[in-house]
């Protein structure tokens, strides 16, 4: 046997002898004063009818149009949350949740009630759908919100704290005061504002504001409100549905493509970038998008790893969070916020748009 072959054999044997070890990921992090705190908010946005019918979206049929099954999302979330008490999730669309709820055994319902009570599962916004804010009459908006809130109160004895209108095309001051502050929300978050407005607000750190939507009611009906830096999706390369192509955090040194240092560096860089356009040391990452978490384990496995290794690195602090936790943290800073008094209309999402949006397609 030649020297090269012998050397190769020793290397191969060495690699085969490396043993993997179980890693207990530390996901118990909480807010750390003085650091940039990255609030990882796990969520799905489930359109109550879009490319498919409501029934098709719920059961997962007609997937030649779009691979989406809300039933899978909710079925998958419950065991994922039970696997780690530090994990959190928010859910919005009551039209789907109530269907799913009626399909569950009393045993599962009791488990979900415990998850809601503990704060692991937060039901936010609370309406049957995420209504448009331009075309509907305000009575219809009130009715569909009331219908959802009544169910949540009756079944869970909680009242949603957060407005979460992330996908309507533009936003109305009426939503801010009548279906925000007057409903009792502590804050209101949204994704779609005009691209020019978003760029300006990034520059002067005014994506988050105090929104005083009623001139007659004044400060008595104002609400803390925030637009996301880039719609309602995660930062680039942090999508982890089972068929997504973002690079995973590979932390097994006995396998190829070990990349903990590289992935942590990317995470910290993205956190710093958002902190530079945000007031206070708290930033929110919306970890999810349309019809995600159909296999929740793939998301939580990666978020567990990021929280563990990013916090070992120490430059920023990552934690499982919810919009309520994020809102409380923002309030606690006693920051002064810009004042907003009018609509976020009209809406265009890119420069080449020929027409501005003022409501749904």
What are these regions (language model features)?
Residues 3-20:
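Cleavable N-terminal signal peptides of Sec/SRP-targeted secreted and luminal proteins
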Residues 18-361:
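Catalytic-domain carbohydrate-binding cleft regions of carbohydrate-active enzymes
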């Amino acid at each position: 046997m030649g020297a090269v072959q012998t050397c190769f054999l020793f290397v191969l044997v060495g690699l085969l002898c490396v043993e993997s070890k179980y890693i207990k990921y530390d996901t118990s992090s909480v807010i750390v004063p003085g650091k940039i705190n990255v609030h990882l908010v796990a969520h799905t946005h489930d359109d109550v009818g879009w490319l498919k019918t409501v029934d098709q979206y719920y059961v997962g049929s007609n997937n030649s149009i779009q691979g989406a099954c809300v039933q899978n999302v909710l079925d998958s979330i419950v065991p994922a949350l039970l696997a780690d008490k530090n994990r959190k999730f928010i859910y919005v669309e009551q039209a789907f949740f109530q269907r799913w709820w009626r399909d569950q055994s009393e045993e599962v319902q009791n488990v979900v009630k415990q998850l809601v009570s503990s704060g692991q599962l937060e039901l936010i916004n609370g309406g049957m759908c995420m209504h448009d804010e331009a075309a509907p009459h305000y009575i219809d908006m009130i009715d569909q919100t009331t219908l959802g809130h009544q169910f949540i109160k009756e079944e869970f004895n909680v009242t949603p704290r957060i407005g979460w209108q992330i996908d309507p095309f533009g936003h109305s001051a009426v939503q801010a005061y009548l279906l925000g502050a007057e409903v009792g929300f502590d804050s209101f978050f949204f994704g779609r504002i005009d691209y020019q407005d978003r760029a300006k607000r990034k520059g002067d750190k005014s994506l988050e504001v105090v929104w005083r939507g009623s001139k007659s009611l004044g400060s008595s009906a104002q609400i803390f409100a925030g637009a996301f830096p880039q719609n309602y999706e995660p930062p680039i390369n942090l999508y982890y549905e089972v068929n997504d192509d973002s690079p995973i955090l590979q932390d097994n040194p006995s396998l190829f493509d070990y990349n903990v240092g590289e992935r942590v560096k990317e995470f910290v860089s993205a956190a710093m970038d958002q902190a530079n356009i945000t007031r206070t040391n708290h930033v929110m990452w919306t970890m999810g998008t349309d019809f995600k978490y159909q296999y929740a384990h793939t998301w939580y496995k990666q978020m567990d790893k990021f929280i563990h290794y990013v916090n070992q690195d120490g430059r920023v602090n990552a934690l499982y969070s919810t919009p309520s936790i994020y809102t409380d943290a923002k309030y606690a800073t006693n920051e002064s916020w810009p004042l907003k008094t009018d609509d976020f209309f009209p809406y265009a999402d890119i420069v080449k748009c020929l027409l501005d949006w003022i409501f749904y397609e």
